[in-house]
């Protein structure tokens, strides 16, 4: 399940643009929105007020973890538990991650998925980010959303879904379904933002996961792709 585009709100498009520009990402402004390119994916942010924080993860090439870690810590603040800034994923994920402080309170993540092919790079740069790997989506009923996605052929990934957390998709792209107000790991204070989110992906038909929370096919028209709410 490749995430082609994610449409979500931010309190400040200028803050988002400045942050990702500092990382070296390609930024495009279009009226009241800003679009950030992450490899094969795009993130489009539109200004609106809301409470809480978003979570996004970006896939890095397998074999580049140490170089990516060094590159990242020179550009932003890493999030930690104690003095630990590197985290192994669940055994079923075969991954490891670095979390970092994003703009507008975002909890961002670089993730190396060992099931993907190894790719060597001389020195890590923003161009080596492969895609948006995960996007957090607050839903009123996690298990009901899992059922909706399963019926469309998008299955749970890794650990068994619970009433407040489920990863759904595959190694190429995941929706992280969570209940509003839950803390984003590895913090205990940044709470899940309950906002409209639209994810453009390889689904064949549009799906609603809650008020303003939707999955849209890449073939949808611009009007159909627009965030709800």
What does each of the following model-derived ranges do?
Residues 92-95:
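Short, small/polar residue-rich loop motifs at catalytic or cofactor-binding pockets
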Residues 85-88:
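Surface-exposed loop and turn segments in beta-propeller and other repeat-based domains
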Residues 1-3, 9-29, 37-82, 101-229:
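Glyoxalase I/VOC metalloenzyme domain signal
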């Amino acid at each position: 399940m490749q995430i082609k585009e994610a449409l979500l709100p931010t309190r400040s498009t200028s803050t988002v643009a400045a942050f990702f520009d500092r990382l070296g990402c390609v930024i495009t402004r279009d009226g009241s929105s800003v679009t950030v390119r992450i490899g094969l994916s795009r993130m489009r942010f539109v200004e609106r007020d809301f409470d809480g924080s978003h979570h996004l993860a970006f896939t890095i090439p397998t074999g580049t973890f140490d170089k990516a870690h060094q590159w990242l810590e020179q550009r932003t603040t890493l999030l930690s538990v104690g003095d630990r800034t590197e985290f192994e994923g669940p055994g079923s994920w075969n991954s490891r991650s670095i979390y970092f402080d994003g703009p507008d309170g975002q909890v961002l993540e670089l993730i190396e998925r060992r099931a993907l092919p190894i790719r060597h790079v001389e020195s890590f740069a923003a161009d080596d980010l492969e895609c948006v790997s995960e996007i957090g989506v607050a839903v009123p009923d996690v298990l009901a959303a899992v059922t909706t996605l399963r019926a469309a052929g998008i299955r749970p990934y890794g650990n068994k879904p619970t009433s407040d957390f489920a990863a759904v998709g595959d190694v190429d792209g995941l929706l992280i379904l969570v209940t509003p107000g839950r803390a984003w790991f590895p913090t205990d204070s940044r709470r899940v933002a309950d906002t409209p989110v639209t994810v453009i992906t390889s689904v064949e038909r549009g799906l609603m996961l809650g008020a303003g929370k939707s999955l849209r096919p890449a073939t949808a028209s611009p009007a159909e792709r627009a965030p709800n709410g």
